[in-house]
Structure formats: structure tokens, C-alpha cells
A protein has these predicted regions:
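Active-site-proximal alpha-helix that buttresses catalytic centers in soluble enzyme cores
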Residues: 1-47, 77, 98-100, 104
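Generic beta-sheet signal
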Residues: 24, 113-125
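Short, well-ordered beta-to-alpha junction loops that form the rim of enzyme active sites
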Residues: 28-31, 57, 122-125
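Short, active-site-adjacent cap segments at secondary-structure transitions
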Residues: 33-35, 60-61, 126-129
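Active-site signature of alpha/beta-hydrolase-fold catalytic machinery across serine-
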Residues: 40, 129-133
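Phosphate-handling substructures
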Residues: 43-106, 144, 156, 163
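Short glycine/proline-enriched coil/turn segments at helix->beta-strand junctions
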Residues: 48, 112-118, 157-159
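Domain-level recognition of soluble alpha/beta enzyme cores
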Residues: 134-162
Length: 163
């Protein structure tokens, strides 16, 4: 929607206040909304909009049979597991889905393949895992972090901040 597009452009402009975005490699989830976000952010900083890597490992946390349901519908159809997830989002696995812990394991080979700084355009679940894996936020705190649209999450040297 228009708000999301404006937020993507704003994220690009905020990134430019931190670094020269042309000096870093960019990678994004291949899912359509992150590809569009990366394209808009790159356009906002005068970079070729399609010149970035798409990596399947950055796909959002899989909610399995809960995919497409509202939280109210999940609570009604699977009250026991919904209550379990409300208590422990990091470890609870939705039916045929993945927990944040499993997402962390999925991201581990990607993380170990990186060298240097990157611009990563991904999803909220991925950001929460990176907060834990790179910035040392506890698993339970990371799973509860609000992810801000239109802002840049900077992860460096074991710390994080929003710009």
C-alpha cells in the first residue's frame, strides 16, 4: 500500500544518513514485499533498484497451518498451542511451521557466509532473530521486539539501535 511504499523510501533516506548505501552489498528476502521494499529504498538513494541479491534463507518465519489466520482464529482453532506460543514465542513451533529458534538455525549458514557489512532487507521474524544472534538480545526479549517500518535497524559489534 501507499504507506508501506512511503516507509520503504524513508528507510532508504535514513540509511543514507548513516553510510553511503552504494558502498555496501544489499540482500533481501525473495518475497514480493521485501523485494519491493529494497527496490524503493534503493531508488530513494539513487541506486539501480534491482541490483541486489535475493536469498531464500531470509524468508519470513513460517507459520505453517496458522499461515493466513488471524490471531483470534488461531486461538479458537488451536487454543493450547496458541497459549503456549503466547508464553514462549522463541521455542513454540506452530503446526507445520517454525519457531524463532528454528529460524535462527535456518539463518546460521547465511550469517556465517557473510563478510563485512551488508544492507539486509527482510521480515520482522528475521530481524528478531538477528537481534538475538548478532546483538545479544535474549531470545524471549527478541521475540517480543516491535519492528519499526520506515526505520533502519543497525546491528553492529554486539549492539543494536534504530535510526
Amino acid at each position: 500500500n501507499d504507506l508501506g511504499r512511503a516507509q520503504a523510501e524513508e528507510a532508504g533516506r535514513r540509511l543514507k544518513t548513516l553510510i553511503d548505501p552504494s558502498t555496501l552489498p544489499w540482500v533481501a528476502s525473495p518475497l514480493s514485499r521485501t523485494v519491493e521494499t529494497a527496490q524503493l529504498a534503493r531508488r530513494a538513494v539513487d541506486l539501480p533498484e534491482n541490483d541486489f541479491v535475493r536469498d531464500d534463507r531470509l524468508k519470513e518465519l513460517a507459520f505453517g497451518r496458522w499461515e493466513g489466520l488471524t490471531w483470534k482464529e488461531v486461538r479458537q482453532s488451536d487454543p493450547q498451542r496458541a497459549a503456549q506460543r503466547e508464553k514462549d514465542k522463541w521455542l513454540t513451533v506452530p503446526p507445520d511451521g517454525e519457531s524463532y529458534q528454528l529460524l535462527s538455525a535456518r539463518l546460521a549458514p547465511w550469517l556465517s557466509s557473510l563478510s563485512g557489512d551488508w544492507v539486509v532487507v527482510a521480515h520482522g521474524g528475521v530481524a528478531r532473530v538477528l537481534l538475538h544472534d548478532l546483538a545479544g538480545v535474549s531470545p524471549h526479549q527478541a521475540a517480543e521486539v516491535d519492528i519499526w517500518q520506515g526505520r533502519v535497524l543497525v546491528l553492529e559489534q554486539g549492539h543494536h539501535r534504530w535510526v
